C-alpha cells in the first residue's frame, strides 16, 4: 500500500510524537515550577517581611544569593550541572543523564531568581539527553544523531508554540539528495515539532507579538531604514560578542564556581537596580510590559536595552545555565522602540522587527530563526518582503565575524 519511503517515515512517526510531547512536558513543568518559585521569591517573601520587591537591597541580595546557590549546584552536583551554555551551541550531542538533575535545578533557580537568560539551552540539553537515554533502549535501531534531531525539533516547537521555526531551521541542515528528498528527512522532525507545539498550546500560549501599529505598504525608503536599524542592532550585538569571551576568561580565572557566580549575581543585581525590574528574568513577559507602558521614552528604552545587553553578557560569562535568544528579543524590541521614539517617521513595526532580526542574527547566526522571531513579534504579512530584503545586508555584515560564544579554558 505504502512506498518503502513512506513506511520508513511512518516508522519514525511514533518516536517523533513521543519525543515531541515529552519535550513540551519537560519545558512546561520546568517553567511552571520556576514561575511558582519566582512568585514566592519576588512577591510573597518580600511582602511578608515588609520589603518592596523592587528595592535595591532586595534586587542585589536576591541575585547575589541566586548566583551563590547556582554556583554551589554547579560545583557539587554530579556532572557539574551540564555544559556551560557560553561555550556549547544550542544543539549538541547528548550529555550524561547524571548531569540533568543539577542542570534542571540550576535552570529553575536562575529563572526564578531573576537572571537575564532564557530556558532554551538547558531545556534543549535536557530533552536531547533524555531522548537519547530512553530512546536508545526502546528503539535501538535509531541512532543518537536521530534522537538529537527529534528532541531538538520537539523542543523548538514547544518553545515557540509552532512547528514553523523547526521546519525553517532544519530545512537548511537536513538537505535532501537524489535518493532521499528533503521533505522525507523533515517528516519526523516536523512531526516532533508539531507534537511539541500542540502540547504546549494545551497548557499556555507563548505571547511574542507586541501591540504595534499595522504596517500598511512597503516603500523604498523603508528598506533603507530597516537596513540601518538592523545595522545598528548588529553593532550593539557585536559589542557583546567582543565582551563575552574576554569577561568569561577573566571570571573563570577564579576557578571556583561559587565565587564566580556569586560575583556575577552581584553585578546582575547592580544592573537590575539601574534598569529596574523590567531588565530581570528571561524577558518575554517584561517585553510585553515595556510595549504596553505609556510612560517610557527614548531614554528609558535605551537604558533598558543597554542594561539588558550588559546583563546578558554578565550572566552568560558567569556560567549561569540559560539561553540567549529570549533576552536578545527583548533587547531588540527595546532598541527598536527607542529608534522609533527618536525618529517617529520610521514606523515602529520596521524599527522593532528589524532590530530584533539584527540582534537574534548576532546571537544565533541563523537567518531563518532571526526572520521567524522578527515576524512573530511583529506579526504583519506586509513586513515579510521587507524583512527578507533587510536580511541580505545584515548577513553580509556578519559574514566571517566571530560568534557570541566564549572560548574553552583548560581546567
From Swiss-Prot:
> What Pfam families does the record point to?
Voltage_CLC
Single GO molecular-function term? chloride transmembrane transporter activity
Mark the transmembrane ranges.
9-29, 54-74, 99-119, 149-169, 186-206, 223-243, 258-278, 296-316, 322-342, 343-363, 386-406
Name this protein carries in UniProt: Putative ion-transport protein YfeO
Report the GO terms under cellular component: plasma membrane
Keywords of the record, alphabetical order, are: Cell membrane, Ion channel, Ion transport, Membrane, Transmembrane, Transmembrane helix, Transport
Give yes or no: UniProt keyword RNA-binding.
no
Report the family membership: Belongs to the chloride channel (TC 2.A.49) family.
What the entry lists under CDD domains is as follows: Voltage_gated_ClC
Where in the cell?
Answer: Cell membrane
Q: Name the InterPro entries on file.
A: Chloride_channel_YfeO (IPR022969), Cl-channel_core (IPR014743), ClC (IPR001807), ClC-type_chloride_channel (IPR050368)
| NCBIfam families for the chain | PRK03655.1
**Topology relative to the membrane, per the entry?**
Multi-pass membrane protein
- State whether keyword rRNA processing applies: no
